[in-house]
């Protein structure tokens, strides 16, 4: 009787483990993936006649790539703006996202401070640019969910990491 009970318990434990494994596999097999982005949106009117603004924009790109590498531990060989997570569930992805948010905010602040330094150093040249010559950057951090069927992903969470603005101030005569 004891042997039958132990055998039944073992079969139950193995079948429960098998069912649990199958449930995990099915959630992994649906193709849902999560990715983190630290990036910026830009609104600008920058031309070859505004080299300082072009330099600032190029510096913003460079610093953002460096920030992505620092945040995710990637390399310049990979696309640093798309950091796929190992998380298979939205809950796990959000937990990883929350760990990186504070780091991303401080990276955004560092980038904005560096760009403001460039803005101050070049204030005289920028003042000579027409008013419509401008550069506005919005730094942000996003958690994106996507499946093979999606053309673009669904934003699950996002955090604003700061803004940078610079514009010429010269009145243009018409």
Predicted regions and their residues:
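Positively charged n-region of N-terminal signal peptides that target proteins for export
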Residues: 1-4
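General helical structural elements
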Residues: 6-7, 98
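Bacterial N-terminal signal peptides
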Residues: 8-16
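C-terminal motif of bacterial Sec signal peptides marking the signal peptidase cleavage site
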Residues: 18-20
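Acidic/polar, low-complexity intrinsically disordered N-terminal segments immediately downstream
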Residues: 23-105, 110-116, 144
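Extracytoplasmic electrostatic interaction patches
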Residues: 104-174
């Amino acid at each position: 009787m004891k042997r039958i009970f132990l055998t039944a318990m073992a079969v139950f434990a193995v079948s429960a483990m098998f069912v649990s494994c199958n449930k995990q596999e099915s959630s992994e097999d649906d193709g849902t993936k999560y990715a983190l982005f630290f990036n910026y949106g830009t609104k600008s009117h920058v031309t070859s006649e505004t080299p300082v603004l072009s330099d600032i924009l190029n510096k913003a790109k460079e610093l953002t790539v460096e920030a992505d590498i620092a945040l995710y531990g990637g390399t310049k060989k990979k696309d640093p703006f798309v950091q796929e997570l190992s998380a298979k569930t939205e809950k796990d992805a959000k937990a990883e996202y929350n760990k990186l948010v504070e780091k991303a905010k401080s990276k955004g602040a560092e980038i904005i401070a560096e760009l403001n330094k460039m803005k101050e150093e070049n204030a005289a040249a920028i003042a000579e640019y027409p008013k419509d010559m401008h550069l506005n950057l919005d730094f942000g951090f996003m958690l994106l969910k996507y499946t093979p069927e999606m053309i673009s992903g669904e934003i699950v969470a996002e955090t604003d990491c700061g803004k940078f603005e610079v514009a010429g101030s010269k009145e243009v005569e018409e």
